[in-house]
Amino acid sequence: MIHPLTYIHPDAKIGPNVKIDPFTTIHRNVEIGEGTWIGSNVTVMEGARIGKNCKIFPSSVISAIPQDLKFRGEETHTLIGDNTTIRECVTINRGTSDRNQTSIGNNCLIMAYSHIAHDCEIGNNCIFSNNTTLAGHITVGDNVVLAGLTAVQQFVRIGSFAFVTGGSLVRKDVPPFVKAAREPLSYVGVNSVGLKRRGFSLEKINHILDIYRILFVRGYNVSKALSIIETEIPVSDERDEIITFIRETGRGIMKGYTRRNEDLA
């Protein structure tokens, strides 16, 4: 059901069984997938591509133009996957010419008052708690949890299955499978609870833990640690994912937690 007090631009494409509550505005060049519900006072702007069975709660703004002074009105998009929930007052900006799109995967939960800036790429099954803020050009892997009030600096990458504790400022890349906390943000262990919930065996979790002991606990520099990991740790998808992630870093990798890190903050 589309409420008569909703405005939908004639060029927008609305799938079957979509429900839109009153006082919502759907701009041109928008596509909304089957079975999606959009609450009242939502604004869906140009370039939005919203998947099937999504839920978008009141007062959210989807696909607004980037908050980037270099943006010159080029046609870009915001992609939202199937079964994703966007809670109250979330803002998501569309891409710039850098990536041409901002994308959020399937089965994500973006909680109230969160902000996702231009050119972010968010994987599947992610949870962003209230007031999570992502600057532009951020890449987040699958199954990532960002606790409330987390702020992520532009161009940072967060690896799959990572967990970042509430109130964190993320300035450096966060590798896959880890738990990150403290200030400055540091490795404080493997995300064992999240991995168990996703079906990882104890053997697999210990395998990942062995990798991060070499990288963060034994005191090696990154290049030496990677060399030891490749020599001593059996080949696995998880090992290769971690090595590739670290080698591709642009901003650098967060450190392991020590009392000295905290003293220097």
Residue positions per predicted region:
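Terminal amphipathic alpha-helical/low-complexity segments used for targeting or macromolecular assembly
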Residues: 1-5, 10-11, 16-17, 53, ...
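Structural signal for interior beta-strand "rungs" in well-ordered beta-sheet cores
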Residues: 2-186
